[in-house]
Amino acid sequence: RRFLMKGADKMAEFSNSNTVSVAAGENLPLTETAVKAPACIMHREGSGLVTLRGLTNQCKARFKVSFGGNIAIPTGGAVGPISVALAVGGESLTSATAIVTPAAVENYFNVFVAAFIEVPRGCCVTVALKNTSTQAVSIANSNLIVERVA
C-alpha cells in the first residue's frame, strides 16, 4: 500500500546527555539530535520545544511522544516531591506526569512518561518536557523520542 509508513523514517530522537538544572515551570533544553527528524517533526538544537506537524491526507496525524531520564533535587534545594511532565502547547499533561520524592538532594530517580498526541491536518502542535515542580530540578541523561504512528 502506498500509505504504509516505514520504521525510522517517521521518528526522531532528541537528547541532553548533560546534567541540567531546569527552573520551575521551564522546559528541558534538548541539545543533541540522535536520530534525524523527518519533515513532520521539527526541532531547533538547544531548544526545549519540538513541533509536530499535521502533514497527512487523513483528518489528523498521530504521534507517540516518550521521555526517559533521571531527575533529582539539586544541591541547595529543599527535600520534597519533584515532578516533570510532557507538555502540549505549554500545558502539562497530567496523564504523562512523573512524580518522585527523593530522600536527599542529588538522589536521582529514573522516570519515564509517554503520550499519544493528535495533530489536525495542516496544523502544528508543540511538545516539551516541563518541570512541574515548585523548585528547580536536575535532569540527567534525558531522551525524548517522537514517533509518527498514524
Which residue ranges define each predicted feature?
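Extracellular jelly-roll beta-sandwich "head" domains, especially the C-terminal globular C1q domain
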Residues: 2-150
